[in-house]
Structures are given as C-alpha cells and as structure tokens.
Amino acid sequence: MSERKAFVSRITNETKIQIAISLNGGHIEIKDSILCKKQQENGSDVAAQTTKSQVIDIQTGVGFLDHMIHALAKHSGWSLIVECIGDLHIDDHHTTEDCGIALGQAFKEALGQVRGVKRFGTGFAPLDEALSRAVVDLSNRPYAVIDLGLKREKIGDLSTEMIPHFLESFAEAARLTIHVDCLRGFNDHHRSESAFKALAVAIRESLAPNGTNDVPSTKGVLM
C-alpha cells in the first residue's frame, strides 16, 4: 500500500489554509506553519492528539469545527493537521466552507487512483441518545445528501447551517458520494458528532483493502 499522504495549501482573499494528511496514519508535519506563535500557543488541546499511530492537530479558529474535524480524523484512522486563518470578523462561512474544500482536495490527492480498496463503506455511530448513519462511495461522482435535523442556530461558535455545508464541500472536492443522516437524538451537539463519527467509520471501511489490485468498477476506471 502506498503512503497515501498529501499536503495542500489553499490561499484566497478570504482564507489561508494548510493541510497535511496521511490516510494511513503515522507521522506527518507542516514545516512552515502559517499560524503565528500566539495562535500556536493558544491552539485548542481538545482538537490535538498525538499517539504512536496518529498525529492530529486542528486549528481553524472555530472551536466546534475543530472538534468535528478531529472526530472525523480520529475515527477514519487518519493523521491530519489543519491550519486556517480565515475572515472570522465577517462570519464562519468562508472558514468552514474552505476548510471542507481543502480537506477534500487533500483526501483526493492522498488517495490517488481508486484501486484495491472496497470503494463502498457504511457506518453507524451513537453518541448517547443520538444515532447517525453514513454511506460512502469512492465514486469520483461528487454528491452529498445530508440530513442532520439540527434545530439550534449555533453550536458553540459554529452556525449549524454550516455543518452540512462543510460535509457537502468536502464531498465535492474529494469527489465522493456521501449520504449522512442523523436517525434520532435531541441534543444537536450529539447529533452532529455522531454524524461525523459515522462518516469516519464509513470512510475507513471504503478505504480498506479488498484483496485485489483491481479498480472496483464495472467501467474499469474511477477517475
């Protein structure tokens, strides 16, 4: 299996983003951080975790978004570093959307040709009273159907309307088909987190080896 690593830098007038990813876990780093020393020191430990198998450090400037991306990386088995400086003086839209786009681009680059993997993945994840389901296809046909049933205007400092939009942006850039549904639950934090964890479980299954070196498609290509 290849290293399945990528580094993406995405700079616009609205955001500056750097992402390092390894779909296999293991060591990764960003040598030239775009974050100032104060930002690095004030980074949330809640969204940073280093073990022998994974390195995760998420700093988008939006706490709940950090928390969700951390959960996605952890349960997908990725190592992931995300640095973002966004125009949060306006609102959280550009930061959230652009992080989804950049993460999708990094995922797509790290994955490379879809060959020798299951391609399809299904995941369920509970969090207390909440239960979510996710289905993934490494199809190269970007499509996202997201139904989380969120009712609050915000969770922490993240607008709830941006949570499905992040997933849509990620799927579009990664060229995935994803269906993510929260089946039950009354706490919007739990509903969101269970959805991201279910997606992680589904992605992890879709990337698992299928015992061949074939392209898992009747077309013979997924590109």
Swiss-Prot record:
Entry-linked Pfam families: IGPD
UniProt keyword list: Amino-acid biosynthesis, Histidine biosynthesis, Lyase
Family annotation (InterPro entries): IGPD_sf (IPR038494), ImidazoleglycerolP_deHydtase (IPR000807), ImidazoleglycerP_deHydtase_CS (IPR020565), Ribosomal_Su5_D2-typ_SF (IPR020568)
Pathway: Amino-acid biosynthesis; L-histidine biosynthesis; L-histidine from 5-phospho-alpha-D-ribose 1-diphosphate: step 6/9
GO molecular function, one term: imidazoleglycerol-phosphate dehydratase activity
Catalytic activity: D-erythro-1-(imidazol-4-yl)glycerol 3-phosphate = 3-(imidazol-4-yl)-2-oxopropyl phosphate + H2O
GO aspect biological process, one term: L-histidine biosynthetic process
Keyword Lyase among record annotations: yes
EC number: 4.2.1.19
Family in the record: Belongs to the imidazoleglycerol-phosphate dehydratase family.
Family matches, as HAMAP family: HisB
NCBIfam families linked: PRK00951.2-4 (NF002114)
Name this polypeptide is given: Imidazoleglycerol-phosphate dehydratase
Annotated organism of origin: Torulaspora delbrueckii
Originating gene: HIS3
